[in-house]
Amino acid sequence: MARVDWTKLDLKERVVSINRVSKVVKGGKNFRFSVTVVVGDAERGYVGVGRGKAAEIPDAIRKAIEDAKKHLIKVPIVGTTIPHEVIGEFGAGKVLLKPAREGTGVIAGGPVRAVLESAGIKDVLTKSLGSSNATNMVYATIEGLKRLRTAEDVAKLRGIPVSQLFE
């Protein structure tokens, strides 16, 4: 997949999780921070997730934002929702994403909500299955969004007109 030029996008950042990790060494414990960040342009339907690790939180956040900008994806949005139901998996985390009627809102837990709102999806139903680890849930959501296809995409792949898809 081609890299997205993030300089032309109006990206908003959201810190999803800050995790203190330690390494036990001869002289005691070395503490560092692992941060997961979601960036997105809700107007254009772009979203990305990144992780950063550093001795200080601000450095870890900066690294995570840089990483997220390198991993942007375009999300297919139909009206205010997603084109079809999908399950995203990452590690032990599974996230079910279902399209919803207009006016439903984003029915999702914290980490999943951050990704969907950053992508510009306004109406969707979700269910977290498996791991409740914030980082795994965020990456599972991204995997689900990567699997989405519009009717036009499916018709093009099959080499048939869109009208023939629904017969």
UniProtKB/Swiss-Prot annotation:
GO terms for biological process: translation. Belongs to the universal ribosomal protein uS5 family. Residues 11-75 form the S5 DRBM domain. The gene is rpsE. Keywords: Ribonucleoprotein, Ribosomal protein, RNA-binding, rRNA-binding. It comes from Thermoanaerobacter pseudethanolicus (strain ATCC 33223 / 39E). Part of the 30S ribosomal subunit. Contacts proteins S4 and S8. It holds the Pfam family Ribosomal_S5_C. One of its GO terms (cellular component) is small ribosomal subunit. With S4 and S12 plays an important role in translational accuracy. Located at the back of the 30S subunit body where it stabilizes the conformation of the head with respect to the body. GO terms for molecular function: rRNA binding; structural constituent of ribosome. It comes from the Bacteria. The N-terminal domain interacts with the head of the 30S subunit; the C-terminal domain interacts with the body and contacts protein S4. The interaction surface between S4 and S5 is involved in control of translational fidelity. This is Small ribosomal subunit protein uS5.
